């Protein structure tokens, strides 16, 4: 990749399926063969996001994608504030002053509320470890839920998810 002009490598795990130890092993292997920065992007959909980032950081990843907590977690990336605090006082300290983030977080809490109200959005309210079985990216989960809700069928969300492995197999 480098000899073809790549300036960095981005690993995108949009469904949050990458396990912490798989991330560790992948990053370690890549760092042995590449000198360009490596970025990891994962989601918290199945509850592994923060742990995956911690193991990737330990393995030497250069960049992790996060989102401020009003837009983070669940089907999004780990929260910026949480990762900053988790890495504080370690050899991986980001040197980000988390206290400077709070006013920004407060602002985006209001922005999120306005977006939810304006677009009548319902966001999933908890992680779903079974996502590893369904293999659906976080954005698609939110979209699927809102489509079902628009049809008055949000109560069938779990049933639709359970059918996904069958659809994948049939295709």
Language model features: what each stretch is:
Residues 1-171:
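Catalytic cores and adjacent flexible loops of soluble metabolic enzymes
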